[in-house]
């Protein structure tokens, strides 16, 4: 039996798909003249397989995204069919006695470097495509295992070292029964994705990829924190009983979906859902979300080879606004960087990406990206109750610049007779100690705050939440983090405004009563967490929650705070 960190509740039975590709090892020795024909054949066979794979991906991309995105892979296929590429590779094999793989690598890398030297930004970015195509071609020449995430077409439990946002953006998620990873934490991307999909996940197992083999039968039990590999029929039957009880309780909680989160003494709280795409709205509604407290727009930018244009973004935002039927939808501008990469943007490799060029810093430097997104949001605001949310704000100067950009775009839309909400609300993420400390200045510039506890905790405690060596130090209920949260809430209330929370702490059952007592106005979380959080709030009095929070904020350690909360809940 293997265990890890409980990331998303549930129980799944299924076969394992191990996301572990073979490493490319190229023989750069001079080949025997007798093997030249064989190496040329290897090149042609590798190219044939690559074209076949890309043709399948192209077809599926057209079905999913339409002809515009299909053309990207058409270009990839044309590059593979290029006669010049073929002639140059064969020439190196024949004249330099190079292996097919070594010759291909040399030509592909030469093409990529030539593109990188060009001044044209679009052409420079094509170097990424060339290397991607070359990587596929090399693996097929060497007959290595290639896992095409787009081509998963049967139900599996996905096993991986870790999963990046760009990887999960490619997966046909309807076939994923659950996630198990070597690395990760409750706030890692894989965990957040699993909760969004309402599928079980256990992360941080340490070495699951070294133990599980493809097609092993797996029981993923993230209720009792156990992973069983090729279990007996007896264990399968026992776990099915546990799953049935869990689903019964889950269905009972779903009955709360149409009820408000009101305390026993009449204090109402707004409960929202965090989403990453239009498809997540179904889960949000099913679980009783009263609003969308966070729309992570960066997922619209992932799993593709180019930036989404204004109309594509507009259609996505408009659809969500209409589906929510005049309930508020908070749209956060693109939060790329840190652990979220876009290969086609050629983001620089940084020593400390979480402290580097990310989120609003990219948008402010690349105004064309910011303007395209803001225009799409403003246009969509005519179709619902949309708010704008800017991430990673650390100064008054930043928010003033951004508000100025919004005003300029509003004037342009007005001049072109394009409708938009003239009174659209603007808020900022409080996710750095800097923004929390100067909240009294920032609140004068905006309509609301949204606290991002994942990054706020990471930056306050100087703990990389993705580093397993120090993950035990990551605790959003640390006294320092709680004091910052309380300060932010108090400042907003003093100025007659409100504060929400969209970090994972908002959906943590241990923190619900504490945050309620601290005066948090809106809780936004993975949809799967909403029914349980509603139940807790509806069973609690606001007056007793306030007393609990006041006491908790006087305690000096994580353990004392947690003990206080647990004693309150159990009595």
Curated annotation (Swiss-Prot):
One of its GO terms (molecular function) is phosphoenolpyruvate-protein phosphotransferase activity. It catalyses: L-histidyl-[protein] + phosphoenolpyruvate = N(pros)-phospho-L-histidyl-[protein] + pyruvate. Mg(2+) binds at residues 431, 455. One of its GO terms (cellular component) is cytoplasm. Its EC number is 2.7.3.9. Gene3D superfamilies: Phosphoenolpyruvate-binding domains, Phosphohistidine domain, PtsI, HPr-binding domain. It comes from the Bacteria. Belongs to the PEP-utilizing enzyme family. General (non sugar-specific) component of the phosphoenolpyruvate-dependent sugar phosphotransferase system (sugar PTS). This major carbohydrate active-transport system catalyzes the phosphorylation of incoming sugar substrates concomitantly with their translocation across the cell membrane. Enzyme I transfers the phosphoryl group from phosphoenolpyruvate (PEP) to the phosphoryl carrier protein (HPr). The reaction takes place in three steps, mediated by a phosphocarrier histidine residue located on the surface of the central domain. The two first partial reactions are catalyzed at an active site located on the N-terminal domain, and the third partial reaction is catalyzed at an active site located on the C-terminal domain. For catalytic turnover, the central domain swivels from the concave surface of the N-terminal domain to that of the C-terminal domain. The N-terminal domain contains the HPr binding site, the central domain the pyrophosphate/phosphate carrier histidine, and the C-terminal domain the pyruvate binding site. This is Phosphoenolpyruvate-protein phosphotransferase. The lineage of its organism: Bacteria, Pseudomonadati, Pseudomonadota, Gammaproteobacteria, Enterobacterales. The gene is ptsI.
